[in-house]
Amino acid sequence: VVKLILSVILELVFTVGVWAQDGQGPQIPSVKIKNVGGTVINTADFGTTDKPVIISFWATWCKPCIQELQTYHALYPEWQEKYGVSLVAVSIDDARNASKVAPFIKSRTWTYEVLLDINQEFKRAMNVNNVPHTFVVQNGKVVFSHSAYSSGDEEELEELLKKLTGKK
C-alpha cells in the first residue's frame, strides 16, 4: 500500500513538473457557472493568455481550504503586481449552502473572483476529488495541479509563478 501511494505521488509530481515546463497540460474545460454576483462565466475564458490564473476549489465547511485562501488573500496584491496573476476561488458548496458563500467571502474581504459551482460541473470536468484543490492555467492549458494544503504550499506556487512569468 505504501509503495502504491508513493508511486502515485511521484507520478503526480513528475506530471506537474512536465506540465509546468512545456505548457502542454490538458486544456481547461468549458463550463458555464455563475459568480457570486450572478454573472455567468465560461471557465474556458480563464488563462487564455500568458498571464497565469490560479483556480482554487474550496468549500465553506473546509478548514484547509479557508486557510489556503486566507494565505492567498494576503499574497494576492503582491502576486498581481509581480506576476500579473489572477485568482479564482470556486466554491463547491451545494444549493443548500450556496447562500452562505457571499457573506462568508465578504466577512473575509477576499478581493478575487469567487464562482459558485453548485452542481459541481466544473469540479467534475477538472477531475477534482477533494478540496482544497488548486490549479494554475496559462495559455488555455492546465500547467499545475495540487490537492490539499499545508503551510508553505504557497511558496511552491510562487516559485511556479516565477518560472511561468520569467520574473523574480
Model-derived regions: residue spans:
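Bacterial N-terminal signal peptides
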Residues: 3-17
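Boundary at the C-terminal end of the N-terminal hydrophobic targeting segment
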Residues: 18-22
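A short beta-strand-turn-helix
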Residues: 32-53
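Thiol/disulfide oxidoreductase modules built on the thioredoxin-like
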Residues: 50, 103-110, 118-160
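Short pre-active-site segment immediately N-terminal to redox-active cysteine/selenocysteine motifs
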Residues: 50-53, 58-61, 94, 130
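Hydrophobic beta-strand anchors of alpha/beta hydrolase catalytic cores
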Residues: 54-55, 87, 134
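Short, thiol/selenol-centered motifs that function as redox-active sites or metal-ligating centers
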Residues: 62-66
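Structural microenvironment flanking redox-active thiols in thiol-disulfide oxidoreductases
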Residues: 67-107, 119-124
